[in-house]
């Protein structure tokens, strides 16, 4: 496990820092001359994917708190009017604080420039996990998300996940299901655009856990019929 962590972990860390330094962040401009309600809904669903937390399953916490950095990105299954806006990365900073051995607080915050907008997002919620003496450790979480800053819209969502951890050879694989319930409000003075949009996203979650000492790396993929959300998070244990 240590060898695998060393090779894979160093590669992921290098990729994350390279992305933070040189990547183009995601766009948030929704006004288009050729408006499509289907494309707009997929755009909002993609932003919801990027907004929700990568909630890693920490089985044996050696620290009371974990801080970290993360990146998320979406891939569409078919061409979309908002392809460019959805192709960039979304950065965030995270904190997981254990209240008890089985319950911990989830916090995420992000702020970055996107064209002429300063985008803000913050998430908070809780995760409940099983004990360490079960064959398949599990975790369920609820996270409340908020996005503001773009001139065209604001977005809120509630993220629900249920996942288990399976040991396969030397790897820990996370498998689960998730639901995103979102509500978007648009500020455009255009009769063709709706004033609001609500919906739900159901998806399959697949991830891996790489942990050594107080450092953890958690890549994760979310599968939805219209898009794939990928994210990676690196954490450090403190306290």
Model-derived regions: residue spans:
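Glycine- and aromatic-enriched membrane insertion/assembly motifs of diderm outer-membrane
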Residues: 81-135
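Bacterial N-terminal signal peptides that target proteins for export
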Residues: 2-12
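Outer-membrane beta-barrel architecture
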Residues: 94-96, 123-129, 161-165, 205-209, ...
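Outer-membrane beta-barrel transmembrane domain signature
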Residues: 24-60, 64, 70-85, 145-218, ...
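Contiguous hydrophobic, core-forming segments of folded domains
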Residues: 128-148
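A short, polar/proline- and glycine-enriched secondary-structure boundary/capping micro-motif
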Residues: 117-118, 185-186, 228-232
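Secondary-structure boundary elements
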Residues: 101, 132-136, 167-170, 211
């Amino acid at each position: 496990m240590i060898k695998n962590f060393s090779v894979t972990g160093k590669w992921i860390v290098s990729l994350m820092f390279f992305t933070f330094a040189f990547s183009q962040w995601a766009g948030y401009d929704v006004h288009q001359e050729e408006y499509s309600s289907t494309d707009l809904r997929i755009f909002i669903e993609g932003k919801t994917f990027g907004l929700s937390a990568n909630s890693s399953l920490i089985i044996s916490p050696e620290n009371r708190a974990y801080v970290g950095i993360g990146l998320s990105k979406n891939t569409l299954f078919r061409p979309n009017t908002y392809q460019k806006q959805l192709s960039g990365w979304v950065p965030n900073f995270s904190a997981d604080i254990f209240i008890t051995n089985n319950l911990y607080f989830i916090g995420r915050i992000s702020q970055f420039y996107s064209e002429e907008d300063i985008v803000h997002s913050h998430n908070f919620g809780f995760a409940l996990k099983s004990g360490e003496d079960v064959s398949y450790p599990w975790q369920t979480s609820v996270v409340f998300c908020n996005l503001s800053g773009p001139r065209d819209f604001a977005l809120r969502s509630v993220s629900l996940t249920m996942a288990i951890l399976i040991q396969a050879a030397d790897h820990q694989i996370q498998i689960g299901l998730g639901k995103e319930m979102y509500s978007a409000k648009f500020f455009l003075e255009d009769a063709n655009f709706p004033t609001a949009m609500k919906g739900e996203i159901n998806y399959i979650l697949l991830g891996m856990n790489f942990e050594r000492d107080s450092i953890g790396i958690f890549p994760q993929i979310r599968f939805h019929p219209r898009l794939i959300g990928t994210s990676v998070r690196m954490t450090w244990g403190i306290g």
